[in-house]
């Protein structure tokens, strides 16, 4: 346990030094390839930092916050794009917008009242699922595979929403939500583009989709360029998730996670193309029907391709044990009274 805490301190120190460098020197360099080259060593370091840990909770958090979020924002910053442009007023704000999955709200007046009222219900459901966790393990495997997406969604929504509330108080500005009720999605395009993990979607849109579409438009029609941009985004997301899963499990990639995103990429492209046909425009699918098919497809494919690798490596049990060790460690340090 002490080694993990030491690694946490070292990673924190290296991150602060690296981000401070990015705040001070690269902005003095003209945006473009030269600024990207000046930031490149930091990007490499941020990719390596998750390997400092053996605990999966530290590894996954570092991989998401630093290897994914921070790297994508520094790359965009190299070209005067993203949340870091224009340059934040001080180093603290620059560090927060670099390392945390937060983004200034474009339209602060638009408040999602549904999410505000439903959030306590989500917490209650998650607490109930945790309480009955041991009792439902004997249920059919098919039913459990359907519960895994619910577990992951509620966990991410609760943690990231609490982080957003905290950072809103600290920074004094309205921040974008991370999710927009993904269980209400009526299509794959709606699910991935407008409801699921919106902060990551915005980064992928800026780094992958927009450049690929712009390049492809030079040699083909705008519609085909758009479809290629969508598929390229899913390919990139699949590769990134394979890397994150390697960080967490420390097992050789199986390709299942990448296949999950490739499948969703192909189906999303087909869906977008179908919506543009005269047949679908004339006879549109009823929203309730498309909602049922979308949710069923996401859950079935996630249970088939996304979660098996995590289940085989006992990620849930590992996280529970790690949290118990952390609680015991801090309890012994905080409530230790020498004789």
From Swiss-Prot:
Q: What is its EC number?
A: 2.3.1.75
Cellular compartments annotated: Membrane
- Give the molecular function GO annotations: long-chain-alcohol O-fatty-acyltransferase activity
* Keyword Acyltransferase attributed: yes
Q: Which GO terms describe its biological process?
A: lipid metabolic process
Cysteine disulfide links: none
Q: How does it sit in the membrane?
A: Multi-pass membrane protein
Q: Which residues cross the membrane?
A: 7-27, 39-59, 113-133, 143-163, 226-246, 254-274, 287-307
Please list the reactions this protein catalyses. Answer: a long chain fatty alcohol + a fatty acyl-CoA = a wax ester + CoA
Domain of life of the source = Eukaryota
Enzyme class label: transferase
Per the record, GO CC terms?
membrane
Keyword line: Acyltransferase, Lipid biosynthesis, Lipid metabolism, Membrane, Transferase, Transmembrane, Transmembrane helix
By sequence similarity, the record places it as follows:
Belongs to the wax synthase family.
Task: Give the function comment from the record.
Answer: Catalyzes the final step in the synthesis of long-chain linear esters (waxes).
Q: Which PANTHER family does this one have?
A: LONG-CHAIN-ALCOHOL O-FATTY-ACYLTRANSFERASE 3-RELATED, LONG-CHAIN-ALCOHOL O-FATTY-ACYLTRANSFERASE 7-RELATED
Protein's recorded name: Probable long-chain-alcohol O-fatty-acyltransferase 7
Give the species this sequence originates from: Arabidopsis thaliana
The root-end lineage is:
Eukaryota, Viridiplantae, Streptophyta, Embryophyta, Tracheophyta
Q: Its encoding gene is what?
A: AT7
């Amino acid at each position: 346990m002490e080694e993990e805490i030491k690694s946490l301190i070292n990673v924190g120190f290296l991150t602060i030094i690296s981000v401070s460098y990015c705040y001070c020197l690269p902005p003095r360099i003209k945006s473009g390839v030269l600024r990207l080259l000046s930031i490149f060593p930091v990007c490499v370091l941020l990719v390596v930092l998750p390997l400092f840990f053996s605990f999966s909770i530290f590894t996954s958090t570092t991989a998401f916050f630093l290897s994914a979020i921070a790297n994508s924002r520094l790359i965009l910053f190299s070209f005067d794009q993203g949340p870091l442009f224009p340059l934040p007023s001080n180093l603290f704000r620059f560090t927060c917008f670099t390392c945390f999955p937060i983004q200034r709200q474009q339209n602060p007046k638009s408040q999602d009242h549904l999410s505000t009222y439903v959030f306590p219900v989500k917490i209650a459901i998650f607490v109930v699922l945790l309480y009955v966790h041991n009792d439902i393990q004997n249920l059919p495997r098919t039913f459990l595979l359907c519960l895994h997406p619910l577990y992951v969604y509620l966990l991410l929504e609760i943690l990231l929403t609490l982080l957003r509330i905290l950072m809103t108080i600290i920074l004094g500005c309205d921040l974008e939500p991370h999710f927009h009720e993904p269980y209400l999605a009526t299509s794959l395009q709606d699910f991935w583009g407008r409801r699921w993990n919106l902060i990551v979607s915005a980064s992928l849109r800026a780094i992958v989709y927009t450049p690929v579409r712009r390049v492809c438009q030079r040699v083909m029609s705008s519609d085909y360029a758009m479809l290629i941009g969508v598929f390229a985004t899913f390919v990139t997301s699949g590769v990134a998730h394979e890397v994150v899963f390697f960080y967490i499990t420390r097992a050789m990639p199986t390709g299942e996670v990448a296949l999950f995103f490739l499948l969703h990429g192909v189906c999303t492209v087909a869906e977008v193309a179908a919506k543009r046909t005269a047949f679908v425009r004339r006879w549109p699918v009823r929203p309730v029907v498309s909602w049922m098919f979308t949710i069923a497809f996401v859950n079935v494919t996630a249970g088939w391709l996304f979660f098996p690798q995590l289940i085989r490596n006992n990620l849930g049990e590992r996280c529970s044990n790690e949290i118990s060790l952390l609680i015991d460690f801090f309890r012994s340090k905080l409530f230790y009274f020498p004789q």
